[in-house]
Swiss-Prot record:
Disulfide bond as UniProt keyword: no
Chain location of the short sequence motif DEAG box per the record: 677-680
Biased composition (Polar residues): 109-123
Gene3D superfamilies: P-loop containing nucleotide triphosphate hydrolases
GO BP terms in the entry: miRNA-mediated gene silencing by mRNA destabilization; regulatory ncRNA-mediated post-transcriptional gene silencing
Function: Probable RNA helicase. Required for RNA-mediated gene silencing by the RNA-induced silencing complex (RISC). Required for both miRNA-mediated translational repression and miRNA-mediated cleavage of complementary mRNAs by RISC.
UniProt name for this protein: Putative helicase mov-10-B.2
Family: Belongs to the DNA2/NAM7 helicase family. SDE3 subfamily.
GO molecular function: 5'-3' RNA helicase activity; ATP binding; ATP hydrolysis activity; RNA binding
Cellular localisation: Cytoplasm, P-body
Family annotation (PANTHER family): BRCA2-INTERACTING PROTEIN-LIKE-RELATED, CANCER/TESTIS ANTIGEN 55
Length: 1015
């Protein structure tokens, strides 16, 4: 192919790449400021265009067109050329002048290094430099990585040593700076052998604008340096950044033993990690090196339980038990199956019962295997719960006598945050510290009578108090799992089969041969009449158009699904005289919200509404407005008799507490309508507690409201999760049942209503999740005064765009025996924004904000703890009124909530842990639901902090960051001037990265979620 034809075939992308190389050459020869087009053309033609000594590149006009097309250059009216200031700049790559090179080649002798040409099996040893040489070297090292381990590249070899004035550990040099000044690091290339070697080339394998390289002899392949024995040569690395964070560079040094063409080059790689730390970062750093904790899950051979005494006098139970609740103890086969599956054993190992269980686990859910499959999944989950809770076991703990001489006090930091959950009526096990390793031990059962902040009051046996306990005696404390919820789920799935709920759980179609049109209702909340989707949902629920199939209210964030459910409940009560309604939710807070909205609306007689709490509910957590409509009276919890409970038209409780109604003998014909709000938060078997035995499949109507695009229930067993336990009934129906799938245009309103009016967020905050998860159908309908409140905030990178992505090159760290990750550099940025929000006087048009209006979200428990510590330690916040009302928590803790301002710390800043996130479904990366929840909590201002190079490996995050770039909302570390992190670095650093060997679930290790107590 001729030179002319070759250039014609080049794509615009290829031409643009040539242009970027030219800009880099200008930068590296200190001529970037030149803007005269004629001068640039001369430089291009004389020094760059034929730099390979072969085929010329396209003419300068074509290159300039490609750069302008990509917004990398612009041409003024006067004919001057201005290159984008953010075009990649960075590590100097020792360019050369091709004309001089060609002259040298013309005069080369066989012994001259310039005559070296690569053989087909050699490393990149051709006499070229600059970007192309670097890329060639990168490709070469990548190919070698397929067959060679990391140690090969970091090892000194053939007598050549690459050292530093600083300590080098495993090929890495760490430098730390505490101010924005130039830091200079000296690297020494030394020949410790007996023969001379040639230092032919050195470069960075990835580009970062914060480093520069320099050496006095300007070593390139065209200007190699001969190193005599014992000779040492200096290479200077300079670092400077104005942004706190961690910056990495991977440097490759190339050498040859001689200048013969057939001589193979060899390489030595060094990693440089520069940390620019603030005082806050120093305060929050690791307390001690991370050492994985191996849990002790062994049990003594013989164990005697010394029974304590449970709390009494706080419960009046008039609801007689009619249907007993089975024990449902996990069989031994379940534990064996879990171990074999965890070890990824060959299927040939499975025999008999284990083979049947494996087959059941791998089979799809049907009504025929419904109970058995859920039994197995629940057993797997429970086994993991028993393991995970052992992380909280404490050794060498002392007790103290309470003022109530029947009780003992025990300090338990973390119990106030449900880590672990400890409720009244639960029990703990105490073992004398000196007897922990004995094969025969006595464990003393202590029942929880009261929970007071981080202290519990235990009721132990009289024998313990009188004969065993001595002041300052030390014990191991073991926590236990409350099995009631999981037992209720087992019973529910079996009752679902016994009561033949197939048409509810696996619906085919409505039985009505002549389906009635939904009535034209006059709604109590008149605003809903102007929202077609909400109005349609209420009318179809009242008409029962889906029966016996459940009716689904698909409610994306901020679309008013709870308001819709409340209106539907009120309309059913009004229009169907013989209706009796059971309204449930997975959590007490969601159930309380339902009850509050019903009572305060005054459209239903409050005497018809009753809120039923579990016996473990703390009276302090019950809203005052519900005191007259619930079963809690001062310090007493009262379970009314069945007849009294059946007299209420609307009964509200959690899904788990609904199981108490089944135990109490409620008829399946009593409730005509069962509503489940936040149905996406519950596992299917938990939802079924409120259905099986309480709803007639022929006559009753089940209504589920939620969003399958948001986070589901928190589970611990990877096996249970991987085999579907994390899929809610709502999500299963919407994704696997044809009745609920979208048609050519929309959903079938007889079975499902998708709410599309968002009343929460500013349109720009809603933009990306709307496009990613909701087909672009959501319409921003929030109050403009509220949603636009921060559009003119002085700290916005782009006025009118209340979304910020702040790029931070941070560092994933762990400490002590906690495997949870934290990133102190992101915390530094978050605290800075918090001060700008709370401590600076708001300008005209921006009202003052209070801590309760701000939420900070992080995916890992340790990051949450560090953020809280940073706020507590900051003197500016110590006396700030209401600072305790600022919520910092995980994504799961914020689901269903909203704040005026949301700040998010993404934490992940290392490629080597991305596979960990994806495999175990933790963190933000590779988890669309967690991303969706995080970005949809904010009403007026959303601030994201993270590492853009890492996050852009994920599609959702990539779309979000690109959106911020397009709209001018990006700030922090420059992203357009940084080449995407090369595979070299990630593969060199991430070879054989594996999770620690432990019995704990990944969720427990990294996220450390609350143990549920909200039943």
């Amino acid at each position: 192919m001729s030179r002319r034809n070759r250039n014609n075939y080049l794509s615009i992308a290829a031409v643009r790449t040539i242009g970027l190389d030219f800009i880099e050459m200008l930068e590296e020869t200190n001529r970037r400021s030149i803007s005269d087009r004629n001068t640039l053309t001369d430089i291009y033609n004389t020094e760059f265009r034929d730099r390979d000594g072969g085929v010329k590149d396209p003419n300068f006009s074509r290159v300039l067109y490609a750069l302008r097309n990509a917004n990398k250059a612009r041409l003024s009216r006067t004919g001057r050329v201005y290159f984008n200031t953010n075009v990649r700049t960075g590590l100097h790559d020792q360019w050369f002048r091709p004309r001089r090179r060609q002259q040298n080649q013309a005069n080369a002798t066989p012994g001259n290094v310039s005559s070296v040409t690569p053989s087909s099996d050699q490393g990149p040893s051709c006499p070229e430099s600059g970007v192309r040489a670097r890329r060639k070297l990168v490709k070469y090292i990548l190919q070698r990585l397929n067959t060679t381990d990391r140690s090969h590249f970091i090892a000194d070899k053939w007598g050549v040593r690459v050292s530093s004035e600083l300590y080098i550990e495993d090929g890495k040099i760490r430098i730390s700076v505490d101010e924005a000044e130039v830091y200079e690091l000296k690297l020494f290339v030394e020949n410790t052998g007996q023969e001379a070697v040639y230092f032919t080339y050195y470069t960075a394998l990835c580009w970062l604008q914060y480093f520069t390289l320099e050496d006095s002899r300007k070593v390139t392949r065209n200007n190699p340096l001969r190193l005599e024995p014992r000779e040492k040569y200096e290479v200077i690395v300079r670092f400077k950044s104005s942004h706190v964070g961690v910056y990495s560079a991977t440097l490759a040094f190339e050498f040859k033993k001689n200048t013969q063409p057939t001589t193979r080059s060899f390489h030595i790689v060094r990693f440089i990690e520069a940390e620019y730390r603030s005082k806050l970062a120093a305060l929050l750093g690791p307390t001690e090196p991370y050492k994985p904790l191996r849990l002790n899950i062994s049990e003594p051979e013989n164990c005697i339980i010394d029974e304590g005494f449970p709390p009494d006098g706080y419960l009046q139970n008039f609801l007689v038990n009619v249907l007993p609740l089975g024990k449902y103890i996990p069989p031994p086969d379940t534990t064996i199956l879990a171990e074999l599956l965890k070890e990824d054993c060959s299927s040939r190992i499975f025999r008999g019962k284990l083979k049947d269980l494996q087959s059941l686990l791998q089979s799809p859910l049907t009504f025929d295997n419904y109970a058995e499959r859920f039994d197995l999944l629940l057993y797997l989950e429970e086994c993991q719960m028993h393991v995970d809770i052992k992380r909280y076991n404490k050794d060498s703990v002392t007790l103290h006598r309470d003022r109530d001489k029947r009780l003992m006090g025990l300090n338990l930091p973390g119990v106030s945050e449900n880590r672990p959950s400890v409720l009244r009526g639960d029990h703990l096990l105490l073992t004398k510290s000196e007897e922990v390793t004995f094969s025969n031990v006595t464990k003393y059962k202590g029942y929880v009578h009261r929970v007071e902040l981080d202290q519990v009051k235990l009721g132990l046996s009289k024998r313990f108090l009188k004969d065993v306990y001595i002041d300052k005696m030390k014990f191991r404390v073991e926590f236990t799992v409350n099995r009631i919820p999981v037992r209720l789920q087992h019973r529910a799935v079996h009752m679902a089969v016994q009561h033949n709920l197939k048409d509810v759980l696996f619906p085919m179609a409505s039985r009505s041969l002549n389906p009635v049109s939904p009535p034209a209702l006059r709604l109590f909340d008149r605003k809903l009449e102007y929202n077609f989707q909400q109005y349609s949902a209420v009318c179809n629920i009242v008409a029962g158009t889906s029966k016996p199939a459940p009716y689904l209210v698909f409610g994306p964030p901020g679309t008013g699904k709870t308001v819709t459910i409340v209106e539907a409940i009120k309309q059913v009560e009004k229009n169907i005289p013989d209706a009796y309604i059971l309204a449930c939710a997975p959590s007490n807070s969601a159930a309380d919200q339902l009850c509050e909205k019903l009572i305060t609306s005054e459209h239903v007689d409050a005497h018809k509404i009753y809120r039923l709490y579990a016996s473990s509910r703390n009276q302090k957590d019950i809203p005052k407005i519900l005191k007259d409509n619930c079963n809690v009276d001062e310090e007493m919890i009262d379970f009314p008799c069945k007849e009294d409970l059946m007299s209420y038209k609307i009964l509200i409780c959690t899904l788990v507490t609904a199981g108490r109604l089944v135990t109490g003998g409620f008829s399946e014909d009593h409730f005509t309508h069962n509503f489940v709000d936040e149905a996406g938060h519950a596992v299917e078997s938990e939802t079924i507690i409120s259905v099986a035995g309480l709803l007639n499949a022929e006559k009753g109507q089940l209504v589920l409201a939620g969003d399958p695009k948001q986070l589901g229930p928190i589970l611990r067993s990877p096996l249970a999760i991987n085999h579907g336990l994390d899929v809610s009934l709502l999500e299963r129906l919407m994704t696997q049942n044809d009745l609920y799938k979208r048609g050519d245009v929309e959903f079938d309103n007889r079975y499902v209503s998708k709410l599309i009016m968002n009343y929460r967020s500013h349109p720009y905050i809603l933009e990306v999740p709307n496009r990613l998860f909701y087909d672009g159908e959501l319409k921003a309908c929030a109050d403009e005064i509220s949603s636009n409140q921060y559009c003119m905030w002085e700290h916005l990178p782009s006025k009118g765009f209340p979304v910020i992505f702040h790029g931070v090159p941070g560092k994933d760290e762990r400490e002590s025996n906690s495997p949870s990750f934290f990133n102190i550099y992101e915390i530094n940025i978050l605290v800075d924004y918090l001060k700008k929000l709370l401590l600076t006087q708001p300008k005209k048009g921006i009202s003052r904000i209070f801590p309760k209006d701000i939420g900070i979200i992080a995916p890992y428990r340790k990051q949450v703890e560090k953020i809280k510590r940073a706020i507590d330690a900051d003197k500016d916040f110590q006396d700030y009124m209401g600072i305790d009302n600022l919520k910092v928590g995980s994504v799961e803790e914020f689901q269903g909530q909203e704040r005026k301002v949301i700040m998010v710390s993404t934490v992940r800043s290392s490629v080597k842990y991305i596979s960990l996130d994806e495999t175990f479904n933790i963190g933000f990366l590779k988890n669309e639901k967690r991303f969706n929840v995080a970005v949809t909590r904010a009403k007026s201002l959303l601030i994201m902090v993270g590492n853009p190079m890492i996050l852009r490996t994920d599609e959702s995050w990539g779309r979000f960051i690109d959106f911020c770039l397009e709209r001018g909302g990006y700030t922090g570390i420059s992203i357009t001037s940084v080449e995407r992190i090369d595979d070299v670095e990630s593969r060199l650093l991430a070879l054989n990265i594996q999770d620690e060997e432990t019995e704990e679930s990944p969720v427990q290790r990294y996220v450390d979620p609350e143990f549920r107590n909200d039943y």
